[in-house]
Every structure is written in C-alpha cells, then in structure tokens.
C-alpha cells in the first residue's frame, strides 16, 4: 500500500486554489454556453447521445429513460434528474423559441406543471436540432475522450444556425451569470448576411435587421428603440414585456378583457393567483373576476366591475401590480472561441458564429477533398482492372505472392493493390468502363470546386452565405415556426402617470390625528367620536372629513409637505398608527392636515413673520421623504397652512398686535421663505386667519364665536406692525382657543 504524503502548505492558498478550480469548472463545464453553438456541456452531450441512438426526426420515438441512461452512463456522470430536466426544457415550446427535441407525452405546461416521469415520456430530435449537428461525421469538429476514456464526445457542435441567439440561454456560475433571450432566426440570418458583406458594420447597422428579442410566448416589448439598441451595444440591459390583450364586446354594452399572450417565463397559474389575491385585498376594484379559459392557446378572461370602466386603465393597473408586465434581463456573458468567458455585444456574437462556420466549412471541404482523392485512386485501379481483368485474375490464381507482381506489372501502390485483392471476383467481373469514367469525371469536378473553396476566401464565404440562406428559407417569416411572435410598441414610462385613485372605491371617511401624532381612519362622515380612546396625555388635534379616493396633505413645522392616499391610512377605532410610520416627518410637529384639491391656493406662514401663497399642485410629494416647500430658519416654525377662501388676512403676534390687509398683497411662489407679513421685534407670529372683509373678523374665545364688524382700525399694509386687537380678543393671542 502506497504511503500517504503529507505536505505543509498555507491554508489560505490551498483554499483559494481549490475554490478557483471549482469556479472554473462551474463556468466552463456547467453554467455558461459556448458562443459558437449556444450549448452548455449537458445540452451537447444529451443531443449527441440522441444522435448516437439515431433518434432523428423521421425515426420512431424512444423512452426518455433510455436517452437519460445513455447520457449519464457514457457522457455526463451526474444526476438523472438534472439531465431529464434539461431534456424536458429542450422540448417545451413555451421555453424554447425553436425546440430541439420533439417530445411525446406530458412534458409540463406553462402553468408550471412538472413533466411526467421519464419512464412514461418519449422523445426524438427535431429538424432544427439536426442542423446543429449537420456534418459532425465529416471531421468538422474536434472530439475528446469522455470522463472514463471509454468513448469520444464532440468539443463543439457544427451549428448550421446561430443557436445562442435563436434560443437564448441562461445560467448562474461562480461570480458571473448569463441571460440571453431568444431571437427570430430569419432576422438573425439577415444580420449575418449583411455582416458578411459589411465586416465593419456596427451595432446600429445590425439593429436594422434584428428588432429585438422574439419570445416563444409572444408578448409586446414596450421599450424605446434607443434603449434596446443600448442594451445590445453593451451586452447588458433589460426589456419590459407586456401581455397581449384585446377587448371583447358582449351584449347590452358590456365587455370583457381577454389576455392572449403573457410574458416569457411567467407561469400562468401563478399569474392568476397573483391577480386573485389583489382582487381579494381590493387592490384592483375595477375588475370583478378573472378566469382561465386556456386550451392549447392562452385565454385569460378578465371581467370589469361595470361597463363604465376604461379597459385601458384596468390593464394599466394590472401591468403595474402584476406579472402581466415583466422585465427580461439581458447579460450576454458567454465562453468565446478562445475558451475565455466575457460579455459580448450583438455584433461580436454574430462575428464569432461566422468565424465558426468558416472553420466548419473549411474542415468539411478538406475532409471531402481527401475522400475524393482516395476514391479517385481507387477508380484509377478499377480502370486498370477493367482493362486487364483476365491477366490480373490469372496472376492471382497462379502466383503465391500476387501482390508484389501486380504492383510491379501495373506500377500501382500497395493500397491500390489491397483494393484489388479485397474485391470479390464477382464484383471485378461486373465492372463497367463507362460507369468508372462517369464517376471519375464527377469526382474531378467536385475536387475542383472544393480546391477552389479552400484556396479562395470569397468562394468560402459564398458557401457560408448559401447555407445561411438555406436555413433562412427553411425557417422564414412565412413559416409557422419562423413567424415573429413578439411585437414592439414604444411606451414612455417616464411620463406615464396612472391615477391610482381610479382603482379605489370612493367611500366617505373621517381622518383623526392626535396631538402625539397617532392617525386613524373611520368610515363615514359625522361619526360619533366619543368612543375613541387615546393614550394618557393625548387628545384629538385634527379631524378631517374626506373620501377614500382623496390625497391627504400633511404639513410639518419645518415647512415640509407629505402626501398620503386616504385609503392607505389604517382603518378602525383600534388601529391607529404613528404618523412616523407613514411619512418621514422625524421629530417635527404637524402644522396642519388638509384634503388636496387641484389648483387650490394655500397660504403658508412662519413664526418669523413671513409667508407666501402656493398652488396645491406644487406641494404634492411623490415619496415618503416629502417635499420641502417653505424654508424655515433655525428656532422658528411653520405655524399655519390654510386654503385661501377669503379676500383678507389677519395676523396676530406675541406682542399682541393685530394687522389686517388684503391677501392680494401676498405673492404666489413655488418655494422659499416668503415675504414679510407683519413686522415686529423680539416676538413671533402666533396665528393667522383668512376671511372676507365684508363679513367682519370672528374668533373663538372658548365659550362662543365673537364677531367684530368694524375692522377699520386694524387695517394696514402688508409688513406693518399692527395695533392692539378688539376688546374681548383671547389672551392667548389666537383666533381659536
């Protein structure tokens, strides 16, 4: 028994070396496809095993268990489940744009159902799969030993069509991943033909032929052309894909929405479940139900809540909330012909394929030329035999060593003599001179053509173009499998604004916010608030009647505005939540809470005595962080935000000075500190009231509403100091107690 050898090595170095070996194995032998044939090793071994089993399109099917057994036994020493899953995917028409395997039996569904066990299903190769391995028996590719040195397997497939782009690929390796969507083969062929004639073509030139991905499940790509082109230029990006739908008119003016195509790699059953959950949670109130009427084709029927619902708005809400709109990633990270993985752009991938085809045709031509030369040598011998048949037969019968004598007599090689001696007498007697001459002539013509191809690059590229055109004809846009399935429709998502309130049922509500910042929502108006309980030391501060479709404006003491959808506020008497969980108000106080009304003028004022008017449309915040509107100096606060519903404004400060002036003296601004409303020293502005001058000035003294009709003494210009308020004005210097 051999004695074990122990070495002292650095643990970190040993670990890194082994991890690197594992990473390289994962990248090169498992996860990333080869740019030339678009296959990973497991795909290549599976298809080659099927070729060895003669599972051609015109042959019978064989059990998948037999195929998987051959693959794991001869070529791929891994689990049978992984190999069978690969086989199943290559047969699924909703997974591959051009399926490589023709499956018979249950191979799963777009609902996410699993395929039947391999002992029940059968398979064979498709026509397009045969194109991947066409001429593999003509020394077009290198072979290497299998894992146990018992057989040989191809290093690469000849690949008569660009399978990498046609069927796409995806995989996750160590530290890198790939995600290539499928494309239309007819368009790829157009791009290849153009690239042959214009080797210096760029991505923008190629994109005149390749519009973008072509998914097996169809759908609509809504990205702009410049976004698509940018993704193919860098080799990285993404595409937004939407479901295809149509409006079906029904009786009595009603209608239903029918979805006929869904995004690539979206499971139909999970999509329906997702919509059903949203329905249950009342997140999409414009629809009443969804049902699946699919057979071999997809048909999802969505019923609107009533016929007044705009189908476009209904679908926009579903696109926003569900996988009816999905994002497909693009990461063209592949193993190049030099066995180095890298991200390529669309032109580089096509160029690699063309170089591969050039090499394949060169090797095939060399192989065929050698075969022709060998056959010509044999025909030369057969002609000699035909002309000297009796003499040769006599030598064979009479001489002990006929081989040497025939070589010397007819000046032929040892190999040629072996042909004569290994040919049966009956075959020699049936030789016909004209047949030998015709075959010799035909072979010489073929030899001349092959030699011309090998010597002249232009002739070689003619053959490449001819074979690409042949594939293009076979899978053209006028064929069932070749017709483009995914269409394009530019939708500018940056400017697209969906009115979320259109999806909410309009109901009356009452919003209550306490002094400590706890907010809750009660159903209805004129609600009995006596039963509402607050924490010790807390009490109600704001009570607002609104509707579930309203937007609520929250103004902080630092002049920042926050926007909430009324329907998003917690419902119920016992479900108050802190305002800090809904908006990022921090430790600042709430100055006011208002119901948003479009184009309404609001008056903002700070304790420093400044203020301005702002349009309500300018204060809507799109994020939880809010929007800063009024700039407040340190030590001061925003004291009020009021809707402008009068022609005059009254200001009262700590020095107990009251000033009334026309509201038109205050400018409208979008943001800032504002202008001086009332001038004072060593004091702060405490309160403001907007009213109509004709009605007089009113205030609440804690007992009843007081009204002062004669306000002439308090009138002035904006920025004045003001005078003492009327007798009976509250001592706290506020218009409401």
From Swiss-Prot:
UniProt GO BP: chromosome segregation; DNA topological change
GO CC, alphabetical: chromosome; cytoplasm; DNA topoisomerase type II (double strand cut, ATP-hydrolyzing) complex; extrinsic component of plasma membrane
Assigned EC number: 5.6.2.2
Site, as annotated: Transition state stabilizer: 119
Sample GO molecular function, one term: ATP binding
InterPro entries attached to this UniProt entry: GyrA/parC_rep (IPR006691), Gyrase/topoIV_suA_C (IPR035516), Topo_IIA-like_dom_sf (IPR013760), Topo_IIA_A/C_ab (IPR013758), Topo_IIA_A_a_sf (IPR013757), Topo_IIA_dom_A (IPR002205), TopoIV_A_Gneg (IPR005742), Type_II_DNA_Topoisomerases (IPR050220)
Membrane topology label: Peripheral membrane protein
Subcellular location per the Swiss-Prot or TrEMBL entry: Cell membrane
Active site, renumbered: 120
Catalytic activity: ATP-dependent breakage, passage and rejoining of double-stranded DNA
NCBIfam families recorded: parC_Gneg, PRK05561.1
Quaternary assembly: Heterotetramer composed of ParC and ParE.
PANTHER family: DNA GYRASE/TOPOISOMERASE SUBUNIT A, DNA TOPOISOMERASE 4 SUBUNIT A
UniProt protein name: DNA topoisomerase 4 subunit A
């Amino acid at each position: 028994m051999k004695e074990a050898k122990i070495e002292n090595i650095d643990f970190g170095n040993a670990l890194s070396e082994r991890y690197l070996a594992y990473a390289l194995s994962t990248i090169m032998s498992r996860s990333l496809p080869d740019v030339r044939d678009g296959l990973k090793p497991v795909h290549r071994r599976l298809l080659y095993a099927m070729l060895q089993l003669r599972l051609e399109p015109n042959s019978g099917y064989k059990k998948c268990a037999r195929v998987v057994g051959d693959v794991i036994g001869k070529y791929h020493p891994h689990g049978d489940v992984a190999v069978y899953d690969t086989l199943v995917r290559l047969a699924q028409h909703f997974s591959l744009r051009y399926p490589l395997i023709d499956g018979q039996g249950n191979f799963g569904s777009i609902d996410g159902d699993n395929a039947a066990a391999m002992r029940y299903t059968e398979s064979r190769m498709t026509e397009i799969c045969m194109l991947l391995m066409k001429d593999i028996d003509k020394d077009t590719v290198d072979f290497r030993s299998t894992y146990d040195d018992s057989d040989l397997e191809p290093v690469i497939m000849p690949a008569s069509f660009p399978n990498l782009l046609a069927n796409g690929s995806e995989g996750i390796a160590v530290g890198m991943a790939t995600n290539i969507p499928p494309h239309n083969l007819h368009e790829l062929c157009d791009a290849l033909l153009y690239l042959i004639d214009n080797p210096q073509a760029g991505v923008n030139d190629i994109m005149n032929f390749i519009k973008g991905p072509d998914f097996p499940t169809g759908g609509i790509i809504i990205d702009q052309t410049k976004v698509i082109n940018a993704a193919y230029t860098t080799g990285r990006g993404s595409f937004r894909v939407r479901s295809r739908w149509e409006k079906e008119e029904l009786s009595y003016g009603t209608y239903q929405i029918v979805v006929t195509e869904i995004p690539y790699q979206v499971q139909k059953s999970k999509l329906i479940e997702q919509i059903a959950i949203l329905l249950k949670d009342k997140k999409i109130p414009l629809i009443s139900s969804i049902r699946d009427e699919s057979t071999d084709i997809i048909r999802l029927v969505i019923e609107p809540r009533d016929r007044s619902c705009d189908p476009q708005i209904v679908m926009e809400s579903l696109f926003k909330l569900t996988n009816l709109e999905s994002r497909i990633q693009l990461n063209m990270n592949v193993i190049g012909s030099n066995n180095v993985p890298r991200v390529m752009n669309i032109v580089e991938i096509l160029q690699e394929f063309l170089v591969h085809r050039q090499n394949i045709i060169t090797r095939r031509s060399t192989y065929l030329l050698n075969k022709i030369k060998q056959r010509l040598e044999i025909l030369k011998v057969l002609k000699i035999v035909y002309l000297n048949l009796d003499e040769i037969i006599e030598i064979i019968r009479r001489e002990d060593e006929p081989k040497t004598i025939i070589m010397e007599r007819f000046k032929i090689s040892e190999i040629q003599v072996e042909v004569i001696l290994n040919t049966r007498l009956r075959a020699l007697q049936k030789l016909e001179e004209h047949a030998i001459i015709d075959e010799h002539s035909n072979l010489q013509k073929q030899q001349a053509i092959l030699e011309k191809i090998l010597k002249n690059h232009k002739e070689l590229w003619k053959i490449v173009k001819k074979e690409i055109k042949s594939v293009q004809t076979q899978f053209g846009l006028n064929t069932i499998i070749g017709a483009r399935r995914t269409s394009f429709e530019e939708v500018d998502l940056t400017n697209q604004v969906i009115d979320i309130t259109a999806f909410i049922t309009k109901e009356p509500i009452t919003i209550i916010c306490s002094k400590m910042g706890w907010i809750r929502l009660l159903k209805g108006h004129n609600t009995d608030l006596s039963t509402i309980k607050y924490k010790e030391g807390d009490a109600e501060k704001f009570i607002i009647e609104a509707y579930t479709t309203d937007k609520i404006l929250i103004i902080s003491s630092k002049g920042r505005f926050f926007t909430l959808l009324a329907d998003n506020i917690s419902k119920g008497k016992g479900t108050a939540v802190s305002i800090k969980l809904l908006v990022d108000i921090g430790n600042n106080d709430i100055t006011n809470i208002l119901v948003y009304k479009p184009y309404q003028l609001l008056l903002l004022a700070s304790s420093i005595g400044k203020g301005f008017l702002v349009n309500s449309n300018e204060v809507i915040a799109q994020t939880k962080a809010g929007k800063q509107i009024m700039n407040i100096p340190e030590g001061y606060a925003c004291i009020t935000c009021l809707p402008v519903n009068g022609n005059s404004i009254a200001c009262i400060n700590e020095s107990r000075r009251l000033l009334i002036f026309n509201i038109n003296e205050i400018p409208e601004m979008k943001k800032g500190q504002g202008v001086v409303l009332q001038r004072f020293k060593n004091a702060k502005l405490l309160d403001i009231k907007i009213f109509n001058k004709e009605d007089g000035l009113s205030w609440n003294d804690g007992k009843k509403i007081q009204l002062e009709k004669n306000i002439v003494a308090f009138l002035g210009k904006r920025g004045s100091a003001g005078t003492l308020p009327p007798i009976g004005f509250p001592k706290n210097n506020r218009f409401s107690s």
